C-alpha cells in the first residue's frame, strides 16, 4: 500500500475544514476579534490626518485634547481583541489537532498487520506527533495572520483610496507582482515541507531504533555506528530546515523591495503639481503611512505561507493515510462462544513481496477439546499458521474453518474473541499487573477472577512479594519484570479470557526448566475442554499432544502422535535425538 499524496491544497483544506467547523463558534469569535484588532490598527493610522490638519493646523481645534482618550481606547480594544483571538484560535487548533490525532490513531488500529510489517514505527509515530502538530499551523497561526493581516491590508487600502485614489492606483500595478511572488514561494514551501515530514520520520525511527536496542548497542559497542547514523539523519533534517528558512528569508526582502518601488513612485507622484495641490500634510502622511503599514501584513502573509503549506502538507499526508483501506471485515457471522472445532483445508499463503510461499497446501483438523502441536525449524511456517487462525493475514487459497464456518465469514472482532493467544513475544502495557491480566475486559472480571488466573499461571508466586501486589505498575512493555515473569502474566491473561481455542506460540520458551514445569501443569489444566494449537521448540512440552505436525519449508512432512513419530524414525525423531542428545 502506497500513500497517494497528489492532492490539491484546496481539497485538503476542505477535508480539514470538516474538523475545524466542529468548533465554528470559537472560530467565529476569533475571526471577529481579529477583524476588530485589524480595524483598530487602521483607525490608528487614520488619526494622523486630523492630528496634522486640525490638531496642529488649527488653534481652535480640541482634537489634541480628545486624542489621548481615543488612543487609550483603541489600545484597550486592541489588547482585549488580541487576547480573545489568541485564546479562541488556540482552543480551536488544540481541538482540531486532538481530533486529527484520534483519527490517525483509530485508523492505525484498523489497519492490517501487513501494513505494519512494511512501515517503520518511527515514521508511524511521527505522523501522530510531528505531522499532527503541523496541522495546528494551518488552523491557528496561519489563520491569525490570514484574517488579521488580510483585514489590515483591506482597511489600509480603503483608507488610502479614500484619501487619495491617484496615489493609491500605483498599488494596482504592484499587486500582481506581489501575488506572483507569494505564489512562487508557496510552491517552494510545500515541497520543502513534504521533505521535512519524511526526514522527521527517519530521525524518529533512528532514535527509536537505538532506544529499543540500547542493550545490544552497549553489548556490541555500537555507539559509534548509531552516532554516525543519527548524525547523518539529523543533518538531513537541519538541511531541510535551512532550506525553509532560506526561502522565508529571501521572500520577505523580495516582497518588500517590490513594495518599496511602489513607495518611490508615490513619492514622485506627490511632487507632481496637479496631485500636490490636492494633498494636505495630513492626507499625504496618512497615505504614506498606510503604504508603509502594508509592509508588515505583507511580510506576515509571506511568512504565514510557509506555516500554512507545512500544515497542508502534513494534513495531506494524514488524510492519505486514513484513505488507505483498513483491515477487511466483510464477515457477518457471529457466535457468543464457539465449540472450538478447527479445520484447515489445503491452505497456501505468501507474504507480500516474498518470492516463495510461506505455506503450501497445508491441511489438518483439530477436533473440539483436542491438542495439535506444530514443530519444525525456525522459519518453517509454524507461526504463520497461528496468524492465519486469527486473520492477522488471509490465506491465498484454501480455507480455515471454525465450527464449520470459514473464518473470513466471521465478524472480525467476534472471531478473535474465540481465541486466546500466548506468544513468545510478550507485550505488556505500562499499567498495573491486574489491568494487564484483565486487558480490554472492562468490568467483566472481578478481582477474585484476576487473582485466580494469576494463581493458575503461578504468577502470584512473585506478585505476592511485591509491595503493591497486583497493583504494581510494570513499566513500558513490562520492563520491571523478568522474561519469565512477563510470560506468566501473559498466560494469566489467556487463562482469564477462557476462550474456546487456545494458541500457544512458544509459550514457555522464556522460562527456565523449573518455571516451565510449574506452568506446564497450569497449561495442562487450562487445555481441558479446549481446542489447542501449540507451536513448540522444546519437544518435551508437546509429547502429550493428540497429534503432532512436523512443518518444513511451509509444508506438513510428518504427522502423528509422539510415539508414532518416534517409531517412524523420520524428521521428528531426528529433532528429538538432537534435543535430548540421543545417539
From Swiss-Prot:
The keyword Cell inner membrane applies. Residues 342-578 form the ABC transporter domain. In MsbA the ATP-binding domain (NBD) and the transmembrane domain (TMD) are fused. Belongs to the ABC transporter superfamily. Lipid exporter (TC 3.A.1.106) family. It is a multi-pass membrane protein. ATP binds at residues 376-383. CDD domains: ABC_6TM_MsbA_like, ABCC_MsbA. NCBIfam families: MsbA_lipidA, PRK11176.1. Residues 28-310 form the ABC transmembrane type-1 domain. Its EC number is 7.5.2.6. It catalyses: ATP + H2O + lipid A-core oligosaccharideSide 1 = ADP + phosphate + lipid A-core oligosaccharideSide 2. One of its GO terms (cellular component) is plasma membrane. This is ATP-dependent lipid A-core flippase. Involved in lipopolysaccharide (LPS) biosynthesis. Translocates lipid A-core from the inner to the outer leaflet of the inner membrane. Transmembrane domains (TMD) form a pore in the inner membrane and the ATP-binding domain (NBD) is responsible for energy generation. Homodimer. It is found in: Cell inner membrane. PROSITE patterns: ABC_TM1F, ABC_TRANSPORTER_1, ABC_TRANSPORTER_2, MSBA. GO terms for molecular function: ABC-type oligopeptide transporter activity; ATP binding; ATP hydrolysis activity; ATPase-coupled lipid transmembrane transporter activity. Pfam families: ABC_membrane, ABC_tran. Keywords: ATP-binding, Cell inner membrane, Cell membrane, Lipid transport, Membrane, Nucleotide-binding, Translocase, Transmembrane, Transmembrane helix, Transport. The chain crosses the membrane at residues 27-47, 69-89, 142-162, 165-185, 249-269.
Amino acid at each position: 500500500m502506497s500513500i497517494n499524496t497528489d492532492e490539491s491544497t484546496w481539497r485538503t483544506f476542505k477535508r480539514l475544514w470538516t474538523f475545524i467547523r466542529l468548533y465554528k463558534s470559537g472560530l467565529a469569535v476569533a475571526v471577529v476579534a481579529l477583524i476588530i484588532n485589524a480595524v483598530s490598527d487602521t483607525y490608528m493610522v487614520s488619526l494622523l490626518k486630523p492630528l496634522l490638519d486640525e490638531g496642529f493646523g488649527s488653534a481652535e481645534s480640541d482634537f489634541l485634547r480628545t486624542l489621548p482618550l481615543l488612543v487609550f481606547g483603541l489600545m484597550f480594544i486592541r489588547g482585549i481583541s488580541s487576547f480573545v483571538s489568541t485564546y479562541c484560535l488556540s482552543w480551536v487548533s488544540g481541538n482540531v489537532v486532538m481530533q486529527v490525532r484520534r483519527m490517525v490513531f483509530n485508523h492505525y488500529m484498523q489497519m492490517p498487520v501487513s501494513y505494519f510489517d512494511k512501515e517503520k514505527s518511527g515514521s508511524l509515530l511521527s505522523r501522530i506527533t510531528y505531522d499532527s502538530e503541523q496541522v495546528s499551523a494551518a488552523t491557528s497561526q496561519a489563520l491569525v495572520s490570514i484574517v488579521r493581516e488580510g483585514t489590515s491590508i483591506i482597511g489600509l487600502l480603503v483608507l488610502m483610496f479614500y484619501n487619495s485614489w491617484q496615489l493609491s492606483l500605483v498599488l494596482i500595478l504592484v499587486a500582481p507582482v506581489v501575488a506572483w511572488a507569494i505564489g512562487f514561494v508557496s510552491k517552494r514551501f510545500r515541497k520543502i515541507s513534504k521533505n521535512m515530514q519524511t526526514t522527521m520520520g527517519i530521525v524518529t525511527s533512528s532514535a527509536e531504533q537505538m532506544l529499543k536496542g540500547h542493550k545490544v548497542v552497549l553489548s556490541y559497542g555500537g555507539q559509534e555506528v548509531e552516532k554516525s547514523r543519527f548524525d547523518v539523519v539529523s543533518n538531513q533534517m537541519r538541511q531541510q530546515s535551512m532550506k525553509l528558512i532560506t526561502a522565508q528569508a529571501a521572500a520577505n526582502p523580495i516582497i518588500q523591495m517590490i513594495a518599496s518601488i511602489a513607495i518611490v513612485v508615490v513619492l514622485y507622484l506627490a511632487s507632481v503639481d496637479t496631485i500636490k495641490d490636492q494633498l494636505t500634510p495630513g492626507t499625504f502622511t496618512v497615505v504614506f503611512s498606510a503604504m508603509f503599514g502594508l509592509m508588515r501584513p505583507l511580510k506576515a502573509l509571506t511568512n504565514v505561507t510557509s506555516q500554512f503549506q507545512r500544515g497542508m502538507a502534513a494534513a495531506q499526508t494524514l488524510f492519505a493515510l486514513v484513505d488507505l483501506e483498513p483491515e477487511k471485515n466483510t464477515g457477518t457471522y457471529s457466535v457468543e462462544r464457539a465449540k472450538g472445532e478447527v479445520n484447515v483445508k489445503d491452505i497456501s499463503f505468501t507474504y507480500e513481496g516474498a518470492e516463495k510461499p510461506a505455506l503450501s497446501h497445508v491441511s489438518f483438523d483439530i477436533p473440539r477439546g483436542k491438542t495439535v502441536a506444530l514443530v519444525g525449524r525456525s522459519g518453517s511456517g509454524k507461526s504463520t499458521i497461528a496468524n492465519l487462525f486469527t486473520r492477522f493475514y488471509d490465506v491465498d487459497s484454501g480455507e480455515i474453518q471454525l465450527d464449520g464456518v470459514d473464518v473470513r465469514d466471521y465478524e472480525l472482532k467476534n472471531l478473535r474473541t474465540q481465541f486466546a493467544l500466548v506468544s513468545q513475544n510478550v507485550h505488556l502495557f505500562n499499567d498495573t499487573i491486574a489491568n494487564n491480566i484483565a486487558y480490554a475486559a472492562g468490568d467483566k472480571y472481578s478481582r477474585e477472577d484476576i487473582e485466580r488466573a494469576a494463581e493458575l499461571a503461578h504468577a502470584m508466586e512473585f506478585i505476592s512479594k511485591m509491595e503493591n501486589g497486583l497493583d504494581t505498575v510494570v513499566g513500558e512493555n513490562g520492563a520491571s519484570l523478568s522474561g519469565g515473569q512477563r510470560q506468566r502474566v501473559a498466560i494469566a491473561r489467556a487463562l482469564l479470557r477462557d476462550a474456546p481455542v487456545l494458541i500457544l506460540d512458544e509459550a514457555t520458551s522464556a522460562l527456565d526448566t523449573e518455571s516451565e514445569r510449574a506452568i506446564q501443569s497450569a497449561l495442562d489444566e487450562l487445555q481441558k475442554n479446549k481446542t489447542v494449537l501449540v507451536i513448540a521448540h522444546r519437544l518435551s512440552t508437546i509429547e502429550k499432544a493428540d497429534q503432532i505436525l512436523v512443518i518444513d519449508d511451509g509444508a506438513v512432512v510428518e504427522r502423528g502422535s509422539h510415539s508414532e513419530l518416534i517409531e517412524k524414525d523420520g524428521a521428528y525423531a531426528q529433532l528429538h535425538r538432537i534435543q535430548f542428545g540421543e545417539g
